[in-house]
């Protein structure tokens, strides 16, 4: 017992947080680095190629985040079961994730392939690149089953405290992607005096490279899960277990609606930006890619926050929850101040990595420096949301996120760009206002203590004692 208490003293907790967070951060860093490489490789072909790849990226977020929401339901269930020491209950969740992968993967494969030719039109993509964007989109969604496996099985492993395996699979996926990009995007050419084979497929080559790497990653993480000592679904019946699915769905459904609603907002946001022309679309696409690297500390810490909060709730340890909140928020804000400062200082250098167009670079630098200032505030909302996910409270984040996205970002951007004829800078100003609103809502809810079910339980017990 004393050993357990010592391990959750502040510096012991820092070690625990970082042990869970660093593999996710490293995985995100690798993934973002590959996005950078992808964008740079495609950008070398020309601005049209960059726009074709980036024009449908928000739809990718929409689908990817909806699948990820299913994983959040299992994360809450398994992390709480592990915190309570109930390994049997945690193991039962594994076969249900297999069902989730099969259902989600098959559904989104059929849906997205059927809609691939229509998505660029709905996104107001320039008619000159609509066919190319549609082909890219079709190829990217062919291996959706494998993509669902990477997302959901990866979340399952993290919730049991294994963040390194998803990281290794992510490294493999991204490494294969880079190598295949090099071989498939460009034609056969001379590199350092040597003839290097190239398929010369351009944007299509980038899509094929991504699809193949997803298949490899999906197979690998499935094999790892089948061999896992605690979570292997081997020997379990592949049928719905409602004792597991009901609590998972109670958490997953609001989170799925939140992600779907906010991602649909991203689609509407990007659609309005696409209507501003090729320069604005390219600058927005590249700036988004650059910005994503500087959110890595935030989302890495969110994974640790969700897992540890779920563990603490499962163990019934309210002191640990409070200590976790104080410590992880301090670490998060510190990291986001550093990352925001770096983004502000090096915005021109980052934009020049991906574009040679002076207009695209200048516009991208402006919006990146604007958003850099808001990063520490956004970091607070990321962490509080993560802790609430681990606790199984996903309704409040749903309400806050939808209100911010549609009430501030979308309405504001529509007024600025579509009615007043303003440009990309005004759209990003609306995005920053959205992030600041999230900070106020999540920080206020955290301070109130209502997000923690153990606080509510203690309050009820106090009232009963007084009676």
Listing of model-derived features with the role each one plays in the protein:
Residues 1-24, 78-145, 187, 192-253, ...:
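Short alpha-helical transmembrane segments in multi-pass integral membrane proteins
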Residues 8-40, 44-45, 58-73, 77, ...:
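N-terminal transmembrane alpha-helices
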Residues 18, 22, 34, 70, ...:
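Residue-level signal for transmembrane alpha-helical positions in Major Facilitator Superfamily
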Residues 19-38, 139, 173, 213-217, ...:
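Transmembrane helical elements of multi-pass membrane transporters/channels
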Residues 29-51, 120-127, 183-201, 260-293, ...:
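Helix-terminus/linker motif at the lipid-water interface of multi-pass membrane proteins
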Residues 36-40, 110, 118, 152-156, ...:
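Alpha-helical transmembrane segments of multipass membrane proteins
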Residues 50-110, 147-166, 270, 283-347, ...:
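Small-residue-rich hydrophobic transmembrane alpha-helices
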Residues 71, 139-158, 166-174, 205-221, ...:
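Short runs within selected transmembrane alpha-helices of multi-pass transporters and secretion channels
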């Amino acid at each position: 017992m004393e050993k357990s208490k010592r391990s959750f003293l502040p510096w012991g907790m820092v070690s625990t947080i970082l042990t869970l967070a660093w593999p996710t951060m490293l995985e995100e860093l690798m993934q973002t680095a590959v996005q950078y490489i992808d964008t740079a490789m495609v950008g070398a072909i020309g601005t049209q190629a960059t726009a074709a790849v980036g024009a449908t990226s928000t739809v990718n977020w929409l689908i990817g985040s909806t699948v990820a929401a299913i994983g959040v339901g299992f994360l809450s269930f398994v992390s709480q079961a592990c915190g309570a020491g109930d390994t049997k209950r945690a193991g039962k969740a594994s076969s249900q994730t297999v069902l989730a992968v099969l259902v989600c993967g098959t559904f989104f494969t059929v849906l997205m392939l059927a809609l691939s030719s229509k998505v660029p039109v709905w996104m107001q993509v320039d008619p000159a690149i609509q066919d190319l964007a549609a082909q890219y989109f079709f190829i990217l969604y062919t291996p959706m089953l494998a993509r669902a496996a990477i997302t959901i099985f990866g979340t399952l492993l993290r919730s049991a405290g294994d963040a390194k395996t998803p990281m290794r699979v992510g490294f493999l996926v991204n490494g294969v992607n880079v190598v295949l990009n090099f071989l498939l995007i460009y034609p056969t050419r001379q590199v350092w005096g040597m003839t290097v084979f190239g398929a010369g497929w351009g944007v299509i080559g980038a899509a094929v490279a991504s699809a193949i790497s997803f298949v490899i990653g999906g197979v690998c993480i499935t094999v790892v899960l089948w061999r896992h000592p605690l979570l292997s679904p081997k020997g379990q019946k592949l049928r719905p277990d409602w004792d597991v699915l009901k609590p998972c769905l109670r958490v997953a459904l609001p989170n799925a609606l939140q992600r779907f609603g906010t991602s649909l907002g991203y689609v509407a946001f990007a659609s309005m930006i696409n209507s501003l022309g090729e320069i604005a679309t390219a600058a927005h696409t590249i700036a988004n890619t650059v910005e994503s690297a500087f959110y890595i500390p935030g989302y890495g810490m969110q994974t640790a926050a969700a897992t540890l909060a779920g563990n603490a709730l499962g163990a019934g340890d309210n002191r640990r929850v409070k200590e976790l909140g104080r410590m992880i928020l301090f670490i998060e804000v510190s990291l986001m101040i550093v990352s925001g400062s770096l983004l502000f200082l090096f915005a021109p250098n980052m934009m020049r990595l991906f574009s040679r167009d002076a207009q695209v670079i200048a516009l991208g630098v402006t919006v990146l420096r604007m958003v850099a200032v808001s990063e520490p505030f956004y970091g607070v909302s990321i962490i509080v949301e993560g802790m609430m996910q681990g606790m199984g409270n996903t309704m409040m984040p749903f309400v806050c996120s939808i209100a911010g996205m549609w009430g501030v970002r979308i309405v504001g951007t529509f007024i600025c760009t579509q009615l007043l004829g303003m440009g990309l800078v005004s759209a990003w100003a609306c995005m920053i206002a959205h992030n600041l609103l999230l900070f106020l809502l999540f920080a206020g809810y955290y301070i109130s203590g209502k997000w923690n079910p153990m606080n509510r339980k203690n309050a009820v017990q106090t009232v009963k004692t007084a009676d």
